[in-house]
Amino acid sequence: MTTTAQGEVARGELVVLREKRLSDAPDDYRWRTDAELARFDAARPFAAAYQDYLALYRDELAYPSPYRRSLGIENADGAHIGNAMYYNIDAIRREAEIGITLGEREFWSRGYGTDAVKTLVRHILRTTGFRRVYLKTLDWNARAQKAFEKSGFRICGRSRRGGNNFIVMEYMAAWLDLQRGG
């Protein structure tokens, strides 16, 4: 991966994280209306018409929330394959929750999710001053748990929401410092 993606935020071994753009809307809508992907997110598929979704999407791009940041995930060829975000940003506690979606199934179980998580965590901890990044993953989603563990996350608790059981995992900034040799 030697070319620079437009709006590049961070680069991993397999993926580039970049700013979201309006041209992502068709992919994002397709993924948000996909029943299987919604199940992995403990959500219902988005039911609104594309034009309504597009209006909301434009607003999010024009007026981003200070409590969340959404990024596109690209592969080495520059194809938009998913999204990464951090949200529930708490500047006082110096932490944020993360989430990723690989919407293109041909990239599942091939290291792209792990690389996206590692790249996102490294970016957050190096640029924000946060001390902790955490996530919640469904207790039955073994593939996601494996990717998060390979990325350095450790289980720190459990939670329940909307009839779903979640495993809470965390990554501490001090761990990144240890990986870099102090």
Give a label for each model feature.
Residues 58-72:
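A short helix-loop-beta-strand connector motif used in the catalytic cores of GNAT acetyltransferases and
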Residues 30, 59-62, 122:
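Surface-exposed charged/polar residues within alpha-helices that form helix-capping/stabilizing sites
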